[in-house]
Amino acid sequence: MTPAADPGQGILSRMTETTIGIGGAAESTDMVLNIGPQHPSTHGVLRLRIVLDGERVQHAEPVIGYMHRGAEKLFEARDYRQIIMLANRHDWLSAFSNELGVVMAVERMLGMEVPERAVWTRTLLAELNRVLNHLMFLGSYPLELGGITPVFHAFREREELQAVMEEVSGGRMHYMFNRVGGLKEDVPAGWAGRVRDAVASVRSRMDVYENLVLGNEIFRGRTRDVGVLSAAAVHAYGVSGPIARASGVDFDLRRDEPYLAYGELRDTLKVVTRTEGDCLARFECLLEQTLNSLDLADACLDRMAHLAPGPINQRLPKVLKAPEGHTYAWTENPLGVNGYYLVSKGEKTPYRLKLRSASFNNIQALTELLPGTLVADMVAILGSLFFVVGDIDK
């Protein structure tokens, strides 16, 4: 007779071994966190897929395309007059500069010389548009870090400049004032004086950002040595604009490959750089560049006051066709380098118009910036890249 099996032995054999720990001995797994596509800290529908180990970011991947509207394909179904209306919409904070790049590419294909009066007016409007763009980020970036006051100052300054832009073009954001061969029409009587007053008024209040934002120890603590982008990463990802210059990359198309009237403004044009490459350096570059753009606007007004009366555009045929061929035009947009690759088959619509938008390249640097940082610093780093989602997705 065999002895009865002990029931406790069967229970023990079925038990699994579990390690229990607390604090540093606790077993942990990485967590995947989705930021967006609808999130208060993003400028539009950007999604970030972040892998976290505790409070540290291990991996970050920007997921783009939620605002893609097929702008490049739409260009192929519009003639050279109509694409100006589409070109200023993907980066709604830099509308004039986007129009400018397209018409410069078409003018280069046509071998067209633009009247001097149009060249200087374009330069003035481009710098005013740059100030409008930068003021938006000078106000919104502190807001993302918890400082609500600067954004009210920024919108007050923007309103003064938007008033003169609206007076000359009829639009507050989408100007549609550029034309192939020049501008839509000459500026109204007395407009230059009103621009000079608006520029002086904005300049007189720019010390608010120096004192209220840069003088705030909490802001400096949240941004100094946070999100450091190396010069090597700038070159690797094709980063441009104030973000690249904050990392010590001394490159600005207005100086290095002048277009419009920038070749004659070398004494006034100042390329602002920093070497730290952190969030604070990027904000400082943006602020100082805004002040320089106000100086450039004054220099343009001084030069325009001594121009002889003349045409503001070229007479064009009823049906405008670019000759067969291809060309590339690029401009120093407020957010960085924008490129326009135009291919023509000799028809009234472009065969292909490829956009190289600054925000698309700049946002790729997040895969380099975010790993190793704290989740709490993610918003500070993201906001310091000064991007527009429409400019990424096109």
Swiss-Prot record:
Phylogenetic classification of the source organism: Bacteria, Bacillati, Actinomycetota, Actinomycetes, Kitasatosporales
Main location: membrane
KW Transport (keyword) present: yes
Keyword check for Transit peptide: no
Localization: Cell membrane
EC number, as in UniProt: 7.1.1.-
Protein species of origin: Streptomyces griseus subsp. griseus (strain JCM 4626 / CBS 651.72 / NBRC 13350 / KCC S-0626 / ISP 5235)
Name by which UniProt lists this protein: NADH-quinone oxidoreductase subunit D 2
InterPro entries: NADH_Q_OxRdtase_suD, NADH_UbQ_OxRdtase_49kDa_CS, NDH1_su_D/H, NiFe-Hase_large
Catalytic activity, as annotated: a quinone + NADH + 5 H(+)(in) = a quinol + NAD(+) + 4 H(+)(out)
Assembly and oligomerization: NDH-1 is composed of 14 different subunits. Subunits NuoB, C, D, E, F, and G constitute the peripheral sector of the complex.
Family recorded in the similarity comment: Belongs to the complex I 49 kDa subunit family.
Any GO MF annotation of the entry: quinone binding
Domain of life: Bacteria
Membrane topology: Peripheral membrane protein
Record's function text: NDH-1 shuttles electrons from NADH, via FMN and iron-sulfur (Fe-S) centers, to quinones in the respiratory chain. The immediate electron acceptor for the enzyme in this species is believed to be a menaquinone. Couples the redox reaction to proton translocation (for every two electrons transferred, four hydrogen ions are translocated across the cytoplasmic membrane), and thus conserves the redox energy in a proton gradient.
Keyword terms: Cell membrane, Membrane, NAD, Quinone, Translocase, Transport
GO terms under cellular component: plasma membrane
